[in-house]
Amino acid sequence: MSGFSPASEVLLRHSDDFTESRVLFAGDMQDDLPARFDTAQSRAHTQQFHHWQVLSKPMGDNARYGLVADAEIVADSDTLIYYWPKNKPEAQFQLMNLLSLLPVGTDVFVVGENRSGVRSAEAMLEAHCPLNKVDSARRCGLYHGRLEKQPEFNADGWWGEYQVDDLTIKTLPGVFSRDGLDVGSDLLLSTLSPHTKGKVLDVGCGAGVLAAVLASHSPKVRLTLCDVSAPAVEASRATLAANGFEGEVVASNVFSEIKGRFDMIISNPPFHDGMETSFEAAQTLIRSAVRHLNIGGELRIVANAFLPYPNVLDETFGNHEVLAQTGRFKVYRAVMGRNAKR
């Protein structure tokens, strides 16, 4: 990452205020400012594996990835800088976790784009850390308060679930389509044949619903699931366990931690990164899939109909077909041949 996000640019206006502070950075960190900010000590906690990849190179063990924060990296911080995400339940989970570990008196800064709903931080933290707005620039707000009362926090109390047919889908704040099966995934599932065999990889697995439904009618399938999101990784593991299915679930930035080749790769790829529209992950998925598919294997993805994926599929695989479509979504299939662009 080279350029700074609008939220980081607002923080840089106040950089002189943090030079003596032991800062914990958390939330939706879209750049490497935590590694470059002038502080007495900088540490970072993130639930996003691709953010950890960027920050861990310059910060080493001072950057941590996981569902909940490590108490050891939080305890001696005297300042929290929290980047507000677009998902309010995700923000609430993270902030309650962090504030339950930080000492009373900690300086708390919350920064985010106005369109992300950062204003709601005031009401959310009112009982624990009353906030005041201290700056407004770049269509962002910066809020400050001091921790007055640690909240109670138990991650086990944040789980939710819903049913898809006879399957139990486990979810957590921050997981895509947390409240029920989304229309795109449902369309993709309608194209999957019973009794599928071989090795199947679900990229961007979310709560694990695609893999769970596939396993329910294809018991011989061998599953691997991956996602950048720590809540998604934990939710997918819980979904498989709740339904008695086996499979490996790994944190991975698309294929970064994936080894070997598969007979099918399925995905409902994201096209947002934070508040911004981003096709990078989906294009990486398509272009790199050929290095993770067996000959004759296939990539099957669902996407918003307006997204420009057919050209990328044809450039990479030399073929694609539309298996199903609605006014909003299309399910694409591309088959791995010997002439694919590897």
Curated annotation (Swiss-Prot):
E.C. number(s) listed in UniProt: 2.1.1.172
GO cellular component annotations of the record: cytoplasm
Keywords (A to Z) from UniProt: Cytoplasm, Methyltransferase, rRNA processing, S-adenosyl-L-methionine, Transferase
Catalysed reactions, as listed in the record: guanosine(1207) in 16S rRNA + S-adenosyl-L-methionine = N(2)-methylguanosine(1207) in 16S rRNA + S-adenosyl-L-homocysteine + H(+)
Record-linked CDD domains: AdoMet_MTases
Superkingdom as given in the UniProt entry: Bacteria
Transmembrane segments: none
Chief localisation class: cytoplasm
GO-annotated molecular function: 16S rRNA (guanine(1207)-N(2))-methyltransferase activity; nucleic acid binding
SUPFAM superfamilies: S-adenosyl-L-methionine-dependent methyltransferases (SSF53335)
Compartment(s) of residence: Cytoplasm
Known role: Specifically methylates the guanine in position 1207 of 16S rRNA in the 30S particle.
UniProt subunit comment: Monomer.
Protein name (database record): Ribosomal RNA small subunit methyltransferase C
